[in-house]
């Protein structure tokens, strides 16, 4: 069973210590009641990941753990077979003991677009909401963050993250908790909060923005990356059914509308730092994620549209700062 006690110990003397009033009970309940059919199998695989500490770890330019020279060909093959039991791998890529986990998403491209615009992460306490398997968390740590906490309710993402962490050798200050943001109390403690690829999955985007605000300290920075459409501050796409074959897409605003929402939620210094149409090379089928991907979600006759006829995925990154609220929006 995955143990969260080291996280409790690390935050006991930090500005997150008041979280300990509720978090152990919430995670204890999750461990008792979570019934995902594959979780016991994945935990058994995790228990087989007994490998020497890597001879090197690079989190600055990539997520590379080990050079591959420490393992025999047989050991390397065994490790790759174990890691493949956690398929599909969606966010990455990872390089582990010479094994290239070629994930569906080139998450390093997104990081390269975002990183130049954010406040330096040196010595910051960071929250990554909807962190997936944790790729960006490792890059945040490589950028100098003091502590990185990710939340994502998916048990597969949790196990993928735990696999990478166990193979990294050290007890790095990076932790993934199997929670949704609605399970977090208002912590008012993080220096930077990331929400990337989450907003359009939320039934109430304004509530999501308020929940993000509640996790930031006063003056803390929000990094929000999400799908957008073209248009003015009144433009919002509400898909009738599916968007890009996804049945959990609720609201896709224009950049202007999104900035207005943030202003209404008492954020300041709001600025759009990047817009980017998702390229077929950034999200694609791979040997580690053999299912449908972006090319199947687009109109084969016109890739500027989804199969449903909506504009193809376009993403924007917005940065904003938590301000003293003028009124109680919660």
Curated annotation (Swiss-Prot):
For this protein, the record's Gene3D superfamilies field holds: Vaccinia Virus protein VP39 (3.40.50.150)
Q: Name one GO molecular function term.
A: transferase activity, transferring alkyl or aryl (other than methyl) groups
Matches recorded under CDD domains = AdoMet_MTases
User: Any idea what this protein is called?
Assistant: tRNA U34 carboxymethyltransferase
Positions that bind carboxy-S-adenosyl-L-methionine: 91, 105, 110, 130, 152-154, 181-182, 196, 200, 315
Known InterPro entries for this protein?
Answer: CmoB (IPR010017), Mo5U34_MeTrfas-like (IPR027555), SAM-dependent_MTases_sf (IPR029063)
User: What biological processes does GO assign it?
Assistant: tRNA wobble uridine modification
Q: Which reaction does it catalyse?
A: carboxy-S-adenosyl-L-methionine + 5-hydroxyuridine(34) in tRNA = 5-carboxymethoxyuridine(34) in tRNA + S-adenosyl-L-homocysteine + H(+)
The record describes the protein's role as: Catalyzes carboxymethyl transfer from carboxy-S-adenosyl-L-methionine (Cx-SAM) to 5-hydroxyuridine (ho5U) to form 5-carboxymethoxyuridine (cmo5U) at position 34 in tRNAs.
Q: Which Pfam families match?
A: Methyltransf_9 (PF08003)
**Subunit arrangement?**
Homotetramer.
Q: Which PANTHER family does the entry link to?
A: METHYLTRANSFERASE, TRNA U34 CARBOXYMETHYLTRANSFERASE
Family to which this protein belongs: Belongs to the class I-like SAM-binding methyltransferase superfamily. CmoB family.
Keyword terms: Transferase, tRNA processing
Which EC number(s) does UniProt give?
A: 2.5.1.-
* NCBIfam families, per the entry: PRK15068.1, tRNA 5-methoxyuridine(34)/uridine 5-oxyacetic acid(34) synthase CmoB
HAMAP family (alphabetical): tRNA_carboxymethyltr_CmoB
Species for this entry: Shewanella oneidensis (strain ATCC 700550 / JCM 31522 / CIP 106686 / LMG 19005 / NCIMB 14063 / MR-1)
């Amino acid at each position: 069973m995955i143990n969260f006690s080291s996280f409790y110990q690390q935050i006991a003397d930090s500005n997150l210590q008041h979280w300990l009033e509720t978090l152990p009970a919430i995670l204890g309940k999750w461990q008792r009641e979570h019934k995902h059919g594959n979780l016991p199998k994945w935990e058994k695989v995790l228990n087989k990941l007994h490998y020497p500490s890597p001879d090197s770890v690079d989190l600055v330019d990539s997520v590379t753990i080990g050079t591959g020279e420490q393992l025999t060909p047989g050991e390397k093959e065994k490790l790759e077979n174990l890691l493949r039991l956690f398929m599909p791998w969606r966010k990455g890529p990872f390089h582990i003991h010479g094994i290239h986990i070629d994930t569906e998403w080139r998450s390093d491209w997104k990081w390269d677009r975002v990183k130049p615009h954010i406040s330096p992460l040196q010595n910051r306490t960071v929250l990554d909401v909807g962190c997936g398997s944790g790729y960006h968390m490792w890059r945040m740590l490589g950028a100098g963050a003091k502590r990185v906490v990710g939340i994502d309710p998916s048990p597969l993402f949790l196990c993928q993250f735990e696999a990478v962490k166990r193979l990294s050798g050290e007890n790095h200050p990076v932790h993934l908790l199997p929670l949704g943001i609605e399970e977090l109390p208002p912590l008012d403690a993080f220096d930077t909060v990331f929400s990337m690829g989450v907003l359009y999955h939320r039934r109430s985007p304004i509530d999501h923005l308020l929940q993000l605000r509640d996790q930031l300290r006063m003056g803390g920075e929000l990094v929000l990356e999400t799908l957008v459409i073209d248009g003015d501050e009144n433009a919002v796409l509400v898909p009738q059914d599916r968007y890009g074959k996804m049945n959990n897409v609720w609201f896709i605003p224009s950049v202007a509308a999104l900035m207005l929402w943030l202003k209404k939620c008492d954020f300041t210094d709001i600025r759009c730092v990047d817009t980017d149409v998702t390229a077929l090379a950034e999200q694609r089928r791979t040997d580690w994620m053999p299912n449908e991907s972006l090319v199947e979600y687009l109109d084969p006759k016109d890739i500027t549209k989804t199969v449903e006829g909506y504009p193809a995925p376009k993403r924007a990154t917005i940065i904003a700062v938590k301000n003293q609220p003028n009124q109680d929006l919660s």
